[in-house]
Regions:
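N-terminal export signals
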Residues: 1-20
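Beta-rich, blade/repeat-based domains predominating
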Residues: 28-45, 78-119, 151-179, 219-232, ...
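Short, conserved, GDST-rich strand-edge loop motifs in beta-rich repeat architectures
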Residues: 36-43, 340-353, 397-413
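Short loop/turn segments immediately following the C-termini of beta-strands
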Residues: 54, 129, 189, 241, ...
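Short loop/turn segments immediately following beta-strands, especially the blade-tip
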Residues: 66, 140-143, 198-207, 249-258, ...
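Beta-propeller fold detector
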Residues: 70-86, 145-152, 156-160, 206-219, ...
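Solenoidal tandem-repeat scaffolds enriched in leucines and small polar residues
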Residues: 182-303, 311
């Protein structure tokens, strides 16, 4: 992909419109040790950022007051027993991330991937793609719900034994809570159905009670990637990574708040996504739009959330941009949607290769939206991103490790931006994710996927 440098140090995708919103923190001249631009006065003591790490099967917990790693939540089963087959490090040798899940007697998570907060921010659901299950996380106490005391606990073993979570089906990609928090919808990307769980029962079941947490399976399009709900919680949109379609369901909640889904329509989105590979979607804060990330089409699109769900905008992102998640930021200085781009570009800050985020101005008339600017994420293969409730901070997760010769060489990092001016983001810092310290050795946190900013007790983005 050809890059073009412009005044102000910003670098934009060839063929995209240039605007004069180039920030000194965005371009090739921007340093890694740039002073923080955000006072962080909006951050509260209870705020935390959670990141799923797919290769290490861990969740990183970041304290946004200090932008440092507070803890790592363990979804592996290593070191529950002192005997060699149960250990992470055996005879002084640590396995590779790819090999560790094949060790004998491993019963932990495989491919920790999706993560989403409950409407009140007190609960997280995360999916194990390879282990075909869902785990529930207490977001207040930062612990896995359902773990039990380890009968083999001791100086060289873990104090807890990992729960099995809830087995739901093949390739659970993304879990999503209904707006009332009563249910969890899990898209089974390896199948053609959605698992719908009762949240209260699920909390009991992960602790070992046979609570029949799975209420039903709903047939849908092949390869469902993610479900998301309109603002009222009455309509669900389901995207696919195997077909150029979007399923739209009426939730039909009963008096108890539980759903009885009925398909309204299956939309043909081949004009926007001919390859049929749409991994993520999200509704706008005003509830009027739903935005889709078409990864292999290198585009995002927007549809109305009511009526006949008409297409409102299709926004190309450039050759091989490979968009992942979208996120909305709206405050006194602007109204945008960001799209994280997996592609890694040369010529990033300090000359180091970096991914970028596309900025789309949502304040303009529908049908005219386009990329107005991009900014470097200061790390490689951007994936999950989430803003804080005040919409003045943005956290970005990355899949690839940092390159040799860089300040955080060999580490997976999260990066932080001041987005108090959404059209002019300012880089704040890198956060190296470090390691999970197991009794037998350190397991490095690796390959970050989803990221969520959580304020327990606050009605968040899923409310």
């Amino acid at each position: 992909m050809k890059l073009t440098a412009i005044s102000g140090g910003a670098v934009f995708l060839s063929g995209l419109t240039r605007l004069s919103h180039a920030a000194s923190g965005n371009g090739a001249a921007a340093g890694y040790n740039e002073a923080p631009a955000q006072t962080k006065s909006s951050v509260r003591a209870e705020d935390r950022v959670f990141i799923t790490n797919e290769d290490s099967n861990t969740l990183t917990v970041i304290d946004p007051r200090t932008n440092t790693v507070e803890s790592t939540i363990n979804l592996t089963s290593f070191d529950e027993d002192a005997r060699p087959p149960f250990r992470f490090v055996t005879a002084g040798v640590a396995p590779t991330h790819a090999a560790m899940i094949h060790k004998p007697l491993y019963h932990g998570c495989i491919d920790a991937h999706g993560a989403v907060p409950s409407p009140d921010g007190k609960l997280l659901a995360t999916s194990g793609r390879g282990s075909s299950n869902i785990y529930l996380i207490d977001a207040v106490n930062k612990r896995v719900i359902g773990n039990i005391p380890n009968p083999s606990s001791g100086p060289t073993t873990n104090p807890e034994r990992l729960t099995s979570g809830i087995l739901v089906g093949r390739e659970p990609h993304e879990p999503t809570f209904t707006r009332n928090g009563k249910e969890l919808w899990v898209t089974l990307r390896g199948e053609d159905r959605i698992a719908i769980l009762d949240v209260a029962r699920a909390v009991k079941q992960v602790g070992g009670t046979d609570a029949d947490a799975i209420l039903r399976y709903v047939p849908t399009i092949n390869g469902p990637a993610q479900a998301w709900f309109n603002a009222q919680g009455t309509i669900a949109f389901v995207a696919s990574q195997k077909t150029s379609k979007v399923d739209v369901f009426s939730v039909n909640a009963d008096k108890s708040g539980h759903s009885h889904p009925e398909r309204i329509i299956t939309l043909d989105i081949s004009a926007q996504d001919k390859p049929g590979f749409t991994p993520f979607l999200k509704t706008s804060p005003d509830g009027n739009e739903v935005w889709f990330s078409h990864k292999l089409s290198d585009a995002v699109s927007c549809r109305a959330t009511s009526g006949t769900f008409d297409i409102l905008d299709t926004v190309p992102l450039g050759n091989l941009a490979r968009p992942n998640h979208v996120e909305f930021v709206q405050n006194a200085k602007g109204k945008v949607v960001y799209a994280s781009l997996a592609r890694v570009d040369d010529g990033g800050p300090d000359g180091v290769a970096s991914s970028q985020i596309a900025i789309i101005d949502r304040s303009v008339k529908t049908g005219t939206r386009k990329v107005v600017s991009t900014f470097f994420t200061h790390a490689r293969e951007a994936h999950g991103l989430w803003t804080n409730p005040e919409n003045d901070l943005l956290y970005v997760a990355h899949e690839q490790d940092e390159l040799p010769g860089t300040p955080n060489a060999g580490q997976t990092v999260c990066t932080v931006f001041d987005v108090s001016d959404p059209l002019n983001p300012q880089f704040i810092t890198h956060i190296p994710l470090g390691s999970l310290k197991l009794p037998s050795g350190e397991l490095r946190n690796k390959k970050s996927i989803n990221l969520v900013y959580v304020r327990p007790g606050y009605r968040g983005q899923t409310a």
